[in-house]
Swiss-Prot record:
Protein name, UniProt field: 2,3,4,5-tetrahydropyridine-2,6-dicarboxylate N-succinyltransferase
Entry-linked SUPFAM superfamilies: Trimeric LpxA-like enzymes (SSF51161)
Gene Ontology terms, MF aspect: 2,3,4,5-tetrahydropyridine-2,6-dicarboxylate N-succinyltransferase activity; nucleotidyltransferase activity
Family of the protein in this entry: Belongs to the transferase hexapeptide repeat family.
Gene3D superfamilies, per database record: Hexapeptide repeat proteins, Tetrahydrodipicolinate-N-succinyltransferase, N-terminal domain
InterPro entries reported for this sequence: DapD_Trfase_Hexpep_rpt_fam, Hexapep, Hexapep_transf_CS, THP_succinylTrfase_dom1, THP_succinylTrfase_N_sf, Trimer_LpxA-like_sf
UniProt cross-references to PROSITE patterns, sorted A to Z: HEXAPEP_TRANSFERASES
Binding, substrate: 103, 140
Organism of provenance: Pasteurella multocida (strain Pm70)
Gene: dapD
EC number: 2.3.1.117
Subcellular location: Cytoplasm
Top-level taxonomy: Bacteria, Pseudomonadati, Pseudomonadota, Gammaproteobacteria, Pasteurellales
Length: 274
């Protein structure tokens, strides 16, 4: 019986599973899946033939991990905590950090089951179980990477950014930020929204599945996906009756990778009225 099949079968009877009743095979399978997510061997979502595919069985393994463990004491630098999920770096020493090749600034917190790639920097931030933060990415101060979220290469998550998770409330697919994106301070990308490669999200932009994404060049309104190379700011659209306006995200321009590499982020955002 494959690892996936064991997880799928266990999930169907998840209401019956507790730390005391879980059988050895199921526990071993769940722990192997979490270890695979932690090491980067597995990922909850990946791009296959140009389309994002969610491996639902791995998401189910994350959910099941909460069923098989009791709360226990988690040691912190200044205090103690009490939780079902251990911290990723609990057993790390200097040699292990050097081997992994990333920087972690206190009091950044990363749960076991999240993958952190080389050349990333974690300022005082939070990365939840099942998430993946790829190479060269900066997770800035007080940014949050939610459960199972996928953060690409060379991404900058600015201060206070929130990237939504899949566990609370339960979502079908993870939130995805593709390679070479910039997410401005205090912005929120949630509910499985995909921000495609090379996009720039300005400060204070909120995008969920029900958020209208208005392209001012075409007049088109879309939902749930920011096209590659978009520069996005917060805005509003008038109601049909014309008596009020409702929030939306506005694509003010498109840039290619060459332009993005030559022009600073601030310059792109300063010239949105051109």
């Amino acid at each position: 019986m494959s690892l996936q099949h064991i997880i799928e079968a266990a999930f169907e009877k998840r209401a019956e599973i507790t730390p005391k009743t879980v059988d050895a095979q199921t526990r071993a399978a769940i722990e192997e899946a979490i270890e695979g997510l932690d090491s980067g061997k597995y990922r909850v979502a990946e791009k296959i033939d140009g389309e994002w595919v969610t491996h639902q069985w791995l998401k189910k393994a994350v959910l099941l991990s909460f069923r098989i463990n009791d709360n226990e004491l988690v040691a912190g630098s200044e205090t103690n905590y009490y939780d079902k999920v251990p911290m990723k770096f609990a057993e790390y020493d200097a040699a292990r950090f050097q081997q992994e090749g990333f920087r972690v600034v206190p009091p950044a917190a990363v749960r076991k089951g999240a993958y952190i790639a080389k050349n990333t920097v974690l300022m005082p931030s939070y990365v939840n179980i099942g998430a993946r933060v790829d190479e060269g990415t900066m997770v800035d101060t007080w940014a949050t990477v939610g459960s199972c979220a996928q953060i690409g290469k060379n991404v900058h998550l600015s201060g206070g950014v929130g990237i939504g998770g899949v566990l609370e409330p339960l979502q079908a697919n993870p939130t995805i930020i593709e390679d070479n994106c910039f997410i401005g301070a205090r912005s929120e990308i949630v509910e499985g929204v995909i921000v495609e490669e090379g996009s720039v999200i300005s400060m204070g932009v909120f995008i969920g599945q029900s958020t209208k994404i208005y392209d001012r060049e075409t007049g088109e309104v879309t939902y749930g996906r920011v096209p590659a190379g978009s520069v996005v700011v917060s805005g509003s659209l008038p109601s049909k009756c014309g008596k009020y306006s409702l929030y939306c995200a506005v694509i003010v321009k498109k840039v290619d990778a060459k332009t993005l590499g030559k022009v600073g982020i601030n310059e792109l955002l300063r010239t949105i009225d051109e």
